[in-house]
Amino acid sequence: MSDHLGSSHDEGELSDESHKKSQRASSSDEPNPAKSNKGLESKMRESILSRLSKRKNSESDDDTTEQRFSIQPKNAQKAKEDRYRDKERDKKREKDKRDDRRDVRGPDARQKDRDFKGRQERSGRDQKVHEHRHHHHHRKHETDGHRTNRSNRDRSSERDSEKHKRHIDRHKKSSTTSPDNDKSPHKKSKHTDVPADAKLFDRILDPNYKKKDDDVLVIEDVEMSPIEILEEKEEKEIVEFTIDSPAGPKKYSKFESDPESDHDDTKPKSPGKAEDDDDVIEVLDDALHSDDDADSDEDKYLKTPEDREWEEMTETEQRLHKEAMKKRASMKQKTLIAQLPVFYPGLMGCRNIDEYECVNRVDEGTFGVVYRGKDKRTDEIVALKRLKMEKEKEGFPITALREINMLLKAGNHPNIVNVKEILLGSNMDKIYMAMEFVEHDMKSLLDTMSRRNKRFSIGEQKTLLQQLLSGIEHMHKLWILHRDLKTSNLLMSHKGILKIADFGLAREYGDPLKKFTSIVVTLWYRSPELLLGTRLYSTPVDMWSVGCIMAEFILLKPLFPGRGELEQIKKIFMEMGTPTESIWPGVTELDGWKALTFEKYPYNQLRKRFLAGRLLNDTGFKLLNGLLTLDPKNRFSATQALDHEWFTEEPYPVPPEEFPTFPAKSEQNKAPPPAKQKQQENRISHVDPETAKLLKQFEVRPEQVKPGGFSLKFDPTRF
């Protein structure tokens, strides 16, 4: 068919009959065509007729392309384009379906899918063994179709999103290439991707097809670009302006010399209208003048006015001056504080003991030696307790840790000594604990009063016992047992404040009770249940010690001074009476009671000792007897003792500030004996002027001069 048509093309023009014959000849060569081939033939026939009509018009006159297309049959070209577009759309759909089945994606998407499957395989290792085997067996026997379905199911959500994105892109391309929307001369996409059959007829009928084909390819390259080609627009000129006033950058500069100040003249400013420049400059000038006025007003209050100026001021000016004076004082204080070196315990650790000056040694206890020290920075007097570390070869002593922990927990009370900080010496064996310094310990004070035959008054006894019970109540509410209450662990300041110290044996207790060791508390203040070997105890052991301390406040000596545990329990039973099951239920079950046999002493002989000597009245003796009850369950608690009527009857407790002061042994400030004092006074009075002048040159006081045992005497007559 192509040869025949080609020969007719050389003859000049084809007739309708020759065209029909050629069509019949071509149709006769083909075997029985289907219905779809008839449709294709009709389309081809229409296209050939349209091209023949174009050929005739082009030979008849030299009209333009628009004029030649105007004589076409009605809607013929549009129908042709619609058919081409429908076919192309069907082909694209089939191609997309094939791509979805074959998983045609980019390398990044395939790598993500492989990573996702790898994560699934790694997570599968944590499953049970039988589930893994079952899954492996299932995959071993599955068919290729099952594998395909499973791979499709295992695709990640990213593939679905990519598929959706491709669908949207295809929709956008189809919408942008429609002839109704694209009327621009640059967008002739309706002639792109023409089917092969149509290109065949173009090649036959048009001798200039090759040139047109090249043009079409160029158009395709332009139209396939996703970026819309816009017409070039002329760029608008940017208006620049600068502010000539020096107020701009310097007003808001944070530093005296701005690093960018050298480039302010050349740096472009924000675009704006020229008529707005004057407004900007006026605003900046107003701000500068307002600030200058404010500074000048503040300068008036920088100095304290004199008396004459103060009297001439109004009330408002005086008030402003007072506020300025307060502000200057606070700023001065802040400046002084800022000059001090900052100490961060969490970053810098503990301070060194060299920052304290050791004044003198105070006492030595079970767990350390106590010194009186002075802070070199603040001149504050503190108590420095050096912890004993001789036997600690494997770290910090547990007793010291307990003491620090208990003091930090219970130290927020006026009747409990407060720890300030932990200090380190030259090595780790020298660890100190800085606590508030209290001048007296009650043991030394009671001994001094006993030697001088002096006693506390009843009001003073009530004050001391009330403060002791207040501190004990605070500890017991925090579930803390002191377990070593005695007069040497009670401190008293010059202001009459009693404080509880030495928490080396303190422990926390709970409910139900824990088993503790029974070898606690100094022997003279140890409760009978501890002496009999019980290990389940709580606050009553401290209250027994409080009863012994109350009796010592009155007697100025210990109540039960035993020399051993057997003698101690015997002394207790002699004064309080031998207990029975009716007096103390459960006493016969204690280990000490089972191991020993005790004599039967009459019940409670303390009445004769305190009442007969008129040391206590009946109310006070009831309180003492309640604190020294043998049965720990019936013994008074700290709250019950504080609520006792003995503290509310006359004589009332003496206020702490009215307590008498005593010379503190810890301060070592005893006055010299009278004989030595007179001798020093005589020595100072008999100093001759020349010796006094010499001592002044050497900055030596006369009382510091000690007479020597040997001196040379010269006879003035010989010289």
UniProtKB/Swiss-Prot annotation:
Gene transcribed to yield this protein: cdk-11.1
Summary of the function given for this chain in its UniProt record: Probable cyclin-dependent kinase whose activity is most likely regulated by the cyclin cyl-1/Cylin-L. Important for normal oocyte and sperm development; probably required during multiple stages of gametogenesis. Plays a role in the activation of RAS-ERK signaling in the germ line. Also acts partially redundantly with cdk-11.2 to ensure embryonic viability.
Ranges annotated as biased composition (Acidic residues): 275-285
A Gene Ontology cellular-component term: cytoplasm
Protein name: Cyclin-dependent kinase 11.1
Positions that bind ATP: 362-370, 385
Catalytic residues as annotated in Swiss-Prot or TrEMBL: 484
Compositionally biased spans, kind Basic residues: 130-140, 164-174
